[in-house]
């Protein structure tokens, strides 16, 4: 193990994050990560929940920070856990991600440095993309929440 690996700070608890399957005119916004975690993969915009912030407030803030869009969180659409380990089995990252179904309210996509690209796609048209694990299922569940809330 190198000195860099030994000096790396490992988490002591899971990191709580939110994401948003944002729907506009029957399409969902898919973004490609520009850096780790999930570098180069398509996923949903989102990020960490700050102390004192509700989950819905975190969704609104993270989406605005990453995409410049204004959204309305509709409902929780499931959960996802992402755990990565180093070669020795130590936990490098442990995310608990709560994806929300959300409606687009206003704005046009303008990405921050965390994201490389964004596309509005049909919810059923994700299979040709390299995505984070379970993205298709999350988008399907989110679409069901959007339709049920009409």
Regions of interest found by a model, annotated:
Residues 80-108, 142:
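Active-site-adjacent beta-strand/loop module that shapes the phosphate/pyrophosphate-binding cleft
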